[in-house]
């Protein structure tokens, strides 16, 4: 009761539609950034940018789908329009299957892939780790699946190797942003790379890939000097393109892009001589957990608001399922005593539950630079092998 059949609703409508006469730069959709360095910002897409982005996605060395394919986007539509998949499907005649509420569940994904004959899918690394775990435990397979696209966080090497070796599925790393509609790069090998083997092959596959047609990239140093594409030099990643935003929604015009039209992505990257880009760090120390971004600044500010806390730092620590999870380091005020439970309880109702740190370490002092900034690099080195407790996220 209360449910409507989609096919019945379609049958009740006529096949004619009077298309409105719209200017190509008329807005057609808007998504918001995750707000890791402040409030979420609106990014408005217009018909022209969306069509051009979709053309690029449909190219053979990008998504390369056709009417004979069936795609399964494991990303919500509010997250940059499900990575653009909801547009590339209708453009190419590709069948689209939406996963529903259990989009991260390995058993559900395997069932959908098998029963709907999915050939191409896309999602964050956590999704594929869950699928792999279920396949390995159940002994089931994904017979029709040909390609996976991974983005939103660093792809574990095990996803690439196990999917190919056990299930003959090719995994392609991709990179993009809300500000880019979202696609920026896809890792598709160029001719002449067939000779790569072993660790060299895996290292190449783990890179974010080359810029898709229409996207320009460069890396610069602190003085905005362009750096070489040698795979060694790393700098601030900047992009241009027909589907890169010009300004955030309701922002002061001309305040989003640099004077020469480049967009500062906030990522630090290298680009090799073949044009393959690799993200090496986050300029704002953002923690990427299961494809979602967690602001270390927000967590630090909340912790420091606690009456017993003098100073705090949050770093990302490796997690086998979520890629990274936040670890909170706390320096208490002199003479104060506290506990992990007390500090974590302080976060309840102040930040999203899934962003609360997994663990708390109490320290006598935190390392600082000469200018008074906490040395996050030193902390990451010190706690790089830290084992987080098992918690529900």
Tell me the role of every PLM-derived stretch.
Residues 1-24, 135, 201:
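ANL superfamily adenylate-forming
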Residues 13-26, 30-72, 84, 94:
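Conserved adenylate-forming
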Residues 27, 33-36, 44, 71, ...:
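Conserved S/T- and glycine-rich ATP-binding loop of Class I adenylate-forming
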Residues 51-70, 80-119, 134:
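Conserved AMP-binding/adenylation subdomain of ANL enzymes
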Residues 74-79, 153:
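Conserved AMP-binding
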Residues 91, 118-123, 132-203, 216, ...:
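Gly/Ser/Thr-rich phosphate-binding loop
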Residues 114, 121, 241, 246-247, ...:
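AMP-binding/adenylate-forming catalytic core of the ANL superfamily
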Residues 211-238, 273-274, 336-340, 375:
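Conserved beta-loop-beta connector loops within the AMP-binding
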């Amino acid at each position: 009761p209360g449910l409507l059949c989609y096919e019945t609703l379609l049958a009740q409508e006529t096949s004619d539609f009077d298309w409105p006469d719209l200017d190509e730069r008329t807005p057609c959709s808007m998504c918001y950034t995750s707000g890791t360095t402040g409030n979420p910002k609106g990014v408005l897409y217009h018909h022209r940018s969306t069509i051009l982005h979709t053309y690029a996605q449909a190219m053979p060395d990008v998504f390369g789908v056709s009417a004979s394919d069936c795609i399964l986007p494991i990303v919500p539509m509010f997250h940059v329009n499900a990575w653009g998949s909801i547009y590339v499907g209708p453009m190419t005649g590709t069948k689209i299957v939406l996963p529903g509420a259990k989009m991260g569940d390995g058993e559900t994904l395997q069932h959908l892939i098998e029963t709907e004959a999915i050939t191409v899918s896309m999602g964050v690394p956590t999704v594929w780790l869950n699928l792999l775990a279920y396949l390995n435990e159940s002994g089931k397979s994904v017979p029709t699946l040909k390609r996976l696209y991974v983005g939103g966080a660093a792809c574990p090497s095990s996803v690439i190797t196990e999917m190919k070796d056990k299930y003959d599925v090719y995994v392609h790393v991709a990179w993009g942003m809300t500000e880019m509609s979202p696609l920026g790069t896809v890792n598709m090998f160029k001719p002449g790379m067939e000779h790569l083997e072993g660790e060299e092959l895996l290292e190449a596959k783990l890179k974010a890939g080359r810029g898709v047609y229409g996207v320009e990239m460069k890396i610069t140093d602190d003085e905005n000097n362009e750096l070489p594409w040698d795979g060694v030099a790393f700098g601030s990643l900047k992009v241009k393109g027909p589907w890169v935003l010009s300004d955030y929604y309701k922002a002061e015009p001309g305040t989003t892009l640099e004077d020469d039209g480049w967009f500062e992505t906030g990522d630090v990257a290298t680009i090799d001589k073949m044009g393959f880009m690799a993200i090496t760090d986050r300029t704002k120390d953002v923690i990427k957990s299961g494809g979602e971004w967690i602001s270390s600044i927000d967590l630090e500010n909340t912790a420091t608001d606690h009456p017993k806390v003098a100073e705090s730092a949050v770093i990302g620590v490796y997690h086998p399922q979520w890629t990274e999870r936040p670890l909170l380091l706390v320096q208490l005020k002199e003479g104060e005593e506290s506990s992990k439970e007390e500090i974590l309880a302080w976060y309840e109702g102040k930040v999203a539950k899934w962003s609360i740190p997994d663990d708390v370490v109490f320290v006598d002092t935190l390392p600082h630079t000469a200018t008074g900034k906490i040395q996050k690099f030193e902390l990451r080195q010190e706690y790089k092998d830290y084992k987080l407790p098992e918690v529900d996220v």
